């Protein structure tokens, strides 16, 4: 299985266009050793030719331009994107669909809840019907697994995550299973397994079993501290309130990851306020001590 990190930041990217927190300002003036990051998205393939796009970031055009296999050049109009899987209906995971309109129709896999959000509060399915049929919906059932025909050796097993639906969702304050999902993706030839959950608010025992079964954990790295945005003066809500488990503190992501010594551990969906973006920070050193990696745009993983 080929895994390509197209974007590794949370919503807004890094540096965020309107933010002058210590990270964003430090990056701009050159005092912070860090790398710019686009908004979170990955691509998966079983042959390096046909790719499944997991989430469509607002930065999708730049991301595709930076990854040559996404433009194989086999025809006058072409793309390496064979299907799209949406983990949720958040703006930073779906807005890129608008930029892919010239390539419609697209095969899109998502849950009932996500499809409802994207047909009502943020009606991308309706809007894009005007471009060659738009988006062809394939329902993700939360029981069992599914295979996408373009990548027949990859088996996708979805699981519901405790996180938050977006503000425009009809059930914003009435959570449902399927508002947010994670994926366990297995290459049935190599046996390699990826656990992918860019928005992860809580890890229970059922979820821990899936993580234990994986060779690589690509998980929520949004915040270092739960009250990070409050302390930095850029927000009022905690990480948990937004559906993100912070890395630091009792029961945090680092403590969770300590329970899985075997898999490769990689953080993705990193907010611009997170001190791990500073490559010289003590927090980044703590990750290195724990053998936890920080995803970056253009990172490649093979399982």
Swiss-Prot record:
InterPro entries reported in the protein's UniProt record: Metallo-B-lactamas, PQQ_synth_PqqB, RibonucZ/Hydroxyglut_hydro
Transport keyword on record: yes
GO terms (BP aspect): pyrroloquinoline quinone biosynthetic process
Pathway as given in its UniProt record: Cofactor biosynthesis; pyrroloquinoline quinone biosynthesis
Membrane-spanning segments: none
Any Pfam family matching the protein: Lactamase_B_2
Sorted UniProt keywords: PQQ biosynthesis, Transport
Keyword ATP-binding: no
Superkingdom of origin organism: Bacteria
Gene3D superfamilies membership: Ribonuclease Z/Hydroxyacylglutathione hydrolase-like (3.60.15.10)
Entry's family note: Belongs to the PqqB family.
Function (record text): May be involved in the transport of PQQ or its precursor to the periplasm.
Protein name: Coenzyme PQQ synthesis protein B
Organism of this sequence: Pseudomonas syringae pv. syringae (strain B728a)
Taxonomic lineage: Bacteria, Pseudomonadati, Pseudomonadota, Gammaproteobacteria, Pseudomonadales
Protein's gene: pqqB
């Amino acid at each position: 299985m080929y895994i390509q990190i197209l974007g590794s930041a949370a919503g807004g990217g890094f540096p965020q266009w309107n933010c002058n927190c210590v990270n964003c300002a430090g990056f701009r003036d050159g005092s912070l050793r860090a790398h710019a990051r686009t908004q979170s998205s990955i691509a998966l393939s079983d042959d390096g030719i046909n790719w499944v796009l997991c989430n469509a970031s607002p930065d999708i055009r730049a991301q595709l331009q930076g990854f040559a296999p996404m433009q194989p050049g086999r025809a006058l109009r072409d793309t390496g994107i064979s299907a799209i899987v949406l983990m949720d209906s958040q703006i930073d995971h779906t807005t890129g669909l608008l930029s892919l309109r010239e390539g419609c129709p697209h095969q899109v896999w998502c849950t009932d809840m996500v499809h409802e959000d994207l047909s009502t509060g943020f009606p991308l399915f309706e809007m894009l019907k005007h471009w060659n049929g738009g988006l062809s919906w394939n329902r993700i059932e939360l029981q069992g697994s599914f295979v996408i025909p373009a990548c027949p050796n990859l088996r996708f097993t979805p699981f519901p995550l405790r996180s938050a639906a977006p503000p425009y969702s009809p059930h914003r304050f009435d959570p449902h299973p399927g508002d947010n999902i994670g994926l366990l993706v297995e290459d049935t030839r190599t046996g390699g397994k990826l656990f992918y959950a860019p928005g992860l608010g809580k890890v229970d025992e059922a979820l821990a079993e899936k993580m234990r079964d994986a060779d690589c954990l690509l998980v929520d790295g949004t915040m270092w501290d739960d009250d990070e945005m409050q302390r930095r003066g850029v927000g009022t809500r905690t990480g948990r309130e937004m559906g993100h488990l912070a890395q630091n503190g009792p029961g945090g992501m680092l403590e969770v990851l300590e329970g899985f010594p075997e898999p490769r551990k990689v953080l993705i969906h990193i907010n611009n306020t997170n001190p791990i973006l500073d490559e010289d920070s003590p927090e980044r050193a703590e990750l290195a001590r724990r053998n936890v990696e920080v995803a970056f745009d253009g990172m490649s993983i093979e399982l």
